[in-house]
From Swiss-Prot:
Keyword Cell wall biogenesis/degradation attributed: yes
InterPro entries, A to Z: Glycosyl_transferase_4, PNAcMuramoyl-5peptid_Trfase, PNAcMuramoyl-5peptid_Trfase_CS
Protein name: Phospho-N-acetylmuramoyl-pentapeptide-transferase
Repressor among keywords: no
Source organism: Lactococcus lactis subsp. cremoris (strain MG1363)
Length: 329
């Protein structure tokens, strides 16, 4: 029931709010380095030394609370296990990456190849876990159902890898990723309620609760960042939730911000190579472009709060549009 999910969300939020300050104190006590700052964005100079890996707290709390709730309320289903597994395993990849950067002082963290290989392996295992409870190999596009057969395994891998990295790119300024993802997940919570998929709803609401608790300390000026442990987990979670709810196409609208952020990086890199050093944007992902003045030519750009609010509203509006189209068909 919806009430069970709300209870799980509130508990997750409260524990996260209690846990984050202790996590911050641990970072300061151990004198650990924070998330690297961007030299080209002067506004970020004050962020130097800010603790990172805050996603570890809300991910672990969300996982534990949702698992206990699923067992207590009888929602420990194959769909729940699939969502739980993806969220946990993508968090593990992010944790290893952050751990190498923060604790071992290896600036690169995991190499791109290591990270990609790990994501693909988790995608493969996720497919088999999903297939254990769901025999259908159908993807849903509006009112059409397309059976892609064996290629469904490839679709899951690409979907998980793509969205996990897209959300990772979006996590670049205070509060942006946490609330944007919370809004996206709220849209999927609506779909879960309407279709009475309360097993998936339970973990969705738990994660939303964790994000709201984290935002208390992540809004500008952020006292902590989520790190890859949070952003990779959230991206993978969004992707698998859209599949479990048979609403894959909706993520293209609900997650439009993540798509735009990713495309801005791809376009920038391609154009830079093609023109021998010229740029389309001042900096990518595109939220940094707006920080630096956008296309206006001005030296001063949008404040982080303005970028946050515009991106949040954009996500909220497109989420409503996606839901309207989804339920219309």
């Amino acid at each position: 029931m919806l009430l069970n999910g709300i209870v799980a969300a509130v508990i997750t939020m409260i524990i996260t709010i209690i846990g984050i300050p202790r996590f911050i104190m641990f970072f300061h006590k151990k004198k650990l380095g924070g998330q690297p700052t961007l030299e080209d964005v002067k506004q970020h100079a004050s962020k130097a030394g800010t603790p990172t890996m805050g996603g570890f707290v809300f991910v672990v709390v969300s996982l534990v609370v949702s698992l206990v709730a699923a067992l207590v309320f009888g929602k420990f289903s194959p769909a729940f296990i699939t969502a739980w597994w993806v969220f946990a395993m993508y968090a593990v990849i992010g944790f290893l990456d952050d751990f190498l950067k923060v604790f071992k002082q290896i600036n690169e963290g995991l190499t791109a190849k290591q990270k990609m290989l790990a994501q693909i392996l988790i995608g493969i295992v996720s497919y088999f876990i999903y297939s254990h409870g769901e025999k259908s190999h159908i993807i849903h596009i509006l009112s059409w159902q397309v059976n892609i057969g064996i290629f469904f395994s490839i679709f899951i891998i690409i979907w998980l890898v793509g969205w996990s990295n897209a959300v990772n790119l979006t996590d670049g300024i205070d509060g942006l990723a946490s609330i944007t993802v919370a809004i996206s997940l709220t849209a999927y919570a609506v779909i879960a309620v309407v279709h009475q998929q309360y097993d998936v709803l339970l973990i969705i609401l738990s994660v939303i609760g964790g994000l709201l608790g984290f935002f208390v300390f992540n809004h500008k000026p952020a006292k902590i960042f989520m790190g890859d442990v949070g952003s990779l987990a959230l991206g993978g979670f969004l992707a698998i939730v859209s599949i479990l709810l048979h609403a894959e196409w909706t993520l293209l609208l609900i997650g439009a911000v993540y798509v735009i952020e990713t495309l801005s990086v791809m376009l920038q890199v391609a154009y830079f190579k093609k023109t021998g050093g010229k740029r389309i944007f001042r900096m990518t992902p595109i939220h940094h472009h707006f920080e630096l003045g956008g296309f206006s030519g001005k030296a001063a750009g949008w404040s982080e709060w303005k970028i946050d609010i515009v991106f949040w509203l954009f996500t909220a509006v497109l989420s409503v549009i996606a839901l309207c189209i989804y339920f219309a068909f």
